[in-house]
């Protein structure tokens, strides 16, 4: 029986990617739309769940579209969809399930195992939430690895005979990480990591959106900051402008009928330059400096010690970002890797290592934040320092604070601040049964363990009685094993029906989009279209609407090609209508 392969998934804030080892090399698996990246977007329509590009295209018109859910992982926040509460893990699981399914279709075999990447600066709760999401999606998550580490794996796979110090600058959709690794003889050792979990491409989009809101308000008097539909359109345009400004010095932003004021519909158009973009996002670019310097300091290295700089994440295509990287490190970044795909490829390589398909590769990662407990006076006492290589284990003896104390409360903390209240509490438990004794006499041994996934467990033991209590820190979203199992069973039970629904909803959405295009063309250019063709189009639209209403998807499918022909006809008339005034203007100029 063939050995099961392990896929690598980059579960991103904006986009996600899946990869697998093929012939000793990681390859990217395209989604059903033929794209190598899949938008991390989930849409709910009636009882249907849509993922990826089809979901993203509904973002303007459908209020039940969830984007950037990764930023909510490891929190207690719930997403309300038509009165039903979803956890971030459930939403992420829909993305993972979709990717698992199309990966299976691509490779022609069942897939149950995955390596999933997370930002290096994800805390314990966020890592556990990611594992839970994988479990709900029907995946056994063999390993959670840090995104910059995965990128370095992909970069260094063919360079196992070289010795290099590599800095990975990873600016994604919602998070920013910096990791420094030493590559030597197939060993990838993380020397340090730093980052900012609240900095990414979404922040750059927000700056453009705010700039547009002010411009529109100045020109028309309309304030769009509370108009959800308009804001989604602004976000789409902001993202497009940001991407285009990586290769152009100026772009045009067009927002027809973006709002209404006392004079009627408001349309907005403006030129947006790279200079203006750099100006309004300067503070975001500069925020990346400190984590770079912190990572160098933690690794006890200077910029000149770095041999290669790898850029990861779509946001590193921004020219101002590339400029600051060069200024900080004194060298041009390595451009041999695809910043959107390299993390998933690294995850696939790690999957190959775990499956035994990739040999002579050893990954030594680190914990991004210090771990400890709260002690007398509300102080955080650290047991494991940040940037300690994992897996690891550390013990320390503590005692009681008052005479005859029968129990001790253990508050497990993660962070770098000296006071307990300023750090994240991962969980609390109580060790009871301590024999009566003067304060400071009992010996309580506290042991921290971090596994290869960066997930923490803590044991407290009374040395006198051998009384012991332990806790594996669970996701603060508080999904129990029973909750996860229930979600898995629901997904399995509805898999076939869900697939039929997915195909039908995509067909319906396609038909509705075509109908809207034709109706718009008939309204705007109706007088120019020959009556016979106009009547034919109106009849076709009516038939399609009736099929949609009846949910006759088999018949609807046969109409899609005819609809496409109608759109071509409408497009031709629109182009002709646009060209006529230009010809007229030209004639009038000649006659002057």
Curated annotation (Swiss-Prot):
Polar residues bias (residue ranges): 571-580
What InterPro entries does the record point to? ATPase_NBD (IPR043129), Chaperone_DnaK (IPR012725), Heat_shock_70_CS (IPR018181), HSP70_peptide-bd_sf (IPR029047), Hsp_70_fam (IPR013126)
Phosphothreonine modifications at: 175
Q: Which domain of life is it from?
A: Bacteria
Q: Where is this region: Disordered?
A: 571-592
Gene3D superfamilies from the UniProt entry: 3.30.420.40, Actin, Chain A, domain 4, Substrate Binding Domain Of DNAk, Chain A, domain 1
Q: What keywords would UniProt list here?
A: ATP-binding, Chaperone, Nucleotide-binding, Phosphoprotein, Stress response
Question: Which CDD domains does the UniProt entry name for this protein?
Answer: ASKHA_NBD_HSP70_DnaK-like (cd10234)
The record, for Pfam families, names: HSP70
What induces it, per record?
A: By stress conditions e.g. heat shock.
List residues traversing the bilayer. none
**Mind telling me which SUPFAM superfamilies this protein's record contains?**
Actin-like ATPase domain, Heat shock protein 70kD (HSP70), peptide-binding domain
Q: Name one GO molecular function term.
A: unfolded protein binding
Extract the PANTHER family matched here: HEAT SHOCK PROTEIN 70KDA
- Recorded family membership: Belongs to the heat shock protein 70 family.
Q: What does this protein do?
A: Acts as a chaperone.
Q: What is this protein called?
A: Chaperone protein DnaK
Species in which this protein is naturally found? Mesoplasma florum (strain ATCC 33453 / NBRC 100688 / NCTC 11704 / L1)
């Amino acid at each position: 029986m063939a050995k099961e392969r392990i896929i690598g998934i980059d579960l991103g804030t904006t986009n996600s990617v899946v990869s697998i080892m093929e012939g000793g090399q990681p390859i990217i698996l395209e989604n059903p739309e033929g794209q190598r990246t899949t938008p991390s977007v989930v849409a709910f329509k009636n009882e249907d769940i849509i993922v990826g590009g089809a979901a993203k295209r509904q973002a303007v018109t459908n209020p039940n579209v969830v984007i950037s859910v990764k930023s909510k992982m490891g929190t207690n926040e719930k997403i309300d969809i038509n009165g039903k509460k979803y956890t971030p893990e459930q939403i992420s699981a829909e993305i993972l399930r979709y990717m698992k399914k199309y990966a299976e279709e691509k490779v022609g075999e069942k897939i149950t195992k995955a390596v999933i990447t997370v930002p290096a600066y994800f805390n314990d709760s966020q890592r556990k939430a990611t594992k839970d999401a994988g479990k709900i999606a029907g995946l056994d998550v063999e390993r959670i690895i840090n995104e910059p580490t995965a990128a370095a794996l992909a970069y260094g796979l063919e360079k196992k005979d070289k010795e290099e110090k590599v800095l990975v600058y990873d600016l994604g959709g919602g998070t920013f990480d910096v990791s420094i690794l030493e590559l030597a003889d197939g060993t990838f050792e993380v020397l340090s990591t730093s980052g900012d979990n609240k900095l990414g491409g979404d922040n750059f989009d927000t700056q453009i959106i705010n700039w547009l809101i002010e411009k529109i308000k100045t020109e028309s008097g309309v304030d769009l900051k509370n108009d959800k539909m308009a804001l989604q359109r602004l976000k789409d345009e902001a993202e497009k402008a940001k991407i285009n400004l990586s290769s152009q010095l100026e772009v045009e932003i067009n927002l027809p009928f973006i709002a209404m004021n006392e004079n009627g519909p408001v349309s907005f158009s403006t030129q947006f330059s790279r200079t203006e973009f750099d100006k309004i996002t300067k503070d975001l670019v500069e925020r990346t400096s400190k984590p770079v310097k912190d990572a160098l300091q933690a690794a006890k290295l200077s910029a000149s010690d770095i041999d290669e700089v790898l850029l990861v994440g779509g946001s590193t295509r921004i020219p101002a970002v590339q400029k600051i990287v060069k200024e900080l490190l004194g060298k041009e970044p390595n451009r041999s890797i695809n910043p959107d795909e390299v993390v998933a490829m690294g995850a696939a390589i790690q999957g190959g290592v775990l499956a035994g398909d990739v040999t002579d590769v050893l990954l030594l990662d680190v914990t991004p934040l210090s771990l400890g407990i709260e002690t007398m006076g509300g102080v955080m006492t650290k047991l494991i320092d940040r940037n300690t290589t994992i897996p690891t284990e550390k013990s320390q003896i503590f005692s009681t604070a008052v005479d005859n104390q029968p129990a001790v409360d253990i508050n497990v903390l993660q962070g770098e601040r000296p006071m307990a209240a300023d750090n994240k509490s991962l969980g609390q438990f109580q060790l009871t049964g301590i024999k009566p004794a003067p304060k400071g006499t009992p010996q309580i041994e506290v042991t921290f363990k971090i596994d290869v996934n960066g997930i923490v467990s803590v044991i407290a033991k009374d040395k006198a009685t051998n009384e012991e209590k332990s806790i594996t820190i669970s996701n603060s979203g508080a999904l129990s094993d029973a909750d996860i199992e229930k979600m898995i069973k629901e997904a399995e039970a509805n898999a076939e029906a869900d697939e039929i629904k997915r195909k039908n909803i995509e067909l319906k959405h396609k038909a509705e989009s075509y109908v809207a295009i034709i109706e718009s063309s008939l309204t705007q250019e109706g007088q120019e279209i020959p009556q016979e063709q106009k009547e034919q189009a109106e009849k076709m639209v009516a038939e399609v609407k009736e099929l949609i209403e009846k949910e006759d998807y088999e018949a609807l499918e046969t109409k899609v090609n005819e609809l496409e022909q109608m759109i071509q006809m409408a497009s031709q008339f629109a182009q002709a209508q646009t060209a006529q005034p230009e010809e007229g203007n030209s004639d009038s100029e000649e006659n002057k």
